[in-house]
């Protein structure tokens, strides 16, 4: 397990695309095994994901944030989100299994919330697949309130996801 003190959180840029793709794919395979089809997870292509990340980071607009958690051996997690007016949304928060349960997830999440609050966000939301029980428990432990559910199509079927909300992003940004 990566020690929290050994990790730094930094803004990600286009030069981090390969590492983001590596962490993205590995974290999805670790997180969604048994929830998403094995064939989909096995077919995730590092070059394609690196291109997507590079393009996203090259075209980043004001109010968008991508933070990376870097450990001794490289990137171990990331968080991405954006603000629109007073509302912010976290699109992704993933840590490799080896970096979980050490406080780094909260540190990364709270860091993104601080960045979003600094550019005007008052409220925050995110969506989580209902089958991702560890993530749902993490968000509840950290003040998120479950809200609406919606179907999401993809991966060969339809799954449900639940919204989690924080009415005051400042309370989340102060958690770590």
List each model region and its residues.
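K/E-rich alpha-helical interaction surfaces of small helical-bundle regulatory domains
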Residues: 27-29, 135-140
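Acetyl-CoA-dependent GNAT
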Residues: 2-7, 11-17, 22-35, 39-100, ...
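Short hydrophobic/aromatic beta-strand or adjacent loop that forms the aromatic wall/cage
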Residues: 64, 159-163
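Acidic/histidine-enriched, glycine/proline-rich intrinsically disordered or flexible terminal extensions
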Residues: 172-174
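Conserved acetyl-CoA-binding loop of GNAT-fold acetyltransferases
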Residues: 140-148
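Conserved GNAT acetyl-CoA-binding A-motif
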Residues: 117-127
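Conserved beta-strand-loop-alpha-helix junction that forms the acyl-donor binding cleft
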Residues: 126-135, 153-157
């Amino acid at each position: 397990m990566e020690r929290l003190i050994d990790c730094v959180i930094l803004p990600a840029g286009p030069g981090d695309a390969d590492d983001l793709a590596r962490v993205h794919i590995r974290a999805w395979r670790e997180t969604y095994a048994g929830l998403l089809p094995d064939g989909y997870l096995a077919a995730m292509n590092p070059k394609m994901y690196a291109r997507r990340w590079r393009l996203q980071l090259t075209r980043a607009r004001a109010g968008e944030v991508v933070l990376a958690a870097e450990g001794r051996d490289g990137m171990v997690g990331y968080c991405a989100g954006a603000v629109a007016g007073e509302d912010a949304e976290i699109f992704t928060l993933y840590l490799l299994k080896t970096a979980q349960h050490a406080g780094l997830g909260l540190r990364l999440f709270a860091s993104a919330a601080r960045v979003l609050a600094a550019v005007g966000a008052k409220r925050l939301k995110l969506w989580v697949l209902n089958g991702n029980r560890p993530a749902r428990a993490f968000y509840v432990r950290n003040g998120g309130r479950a809200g609406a559910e919606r179907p999401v199509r993809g991966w060969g079927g339809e799954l449900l996801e639940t919204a989690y909300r924080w009415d005051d992003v400042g309370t989340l940004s102060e958690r770590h």
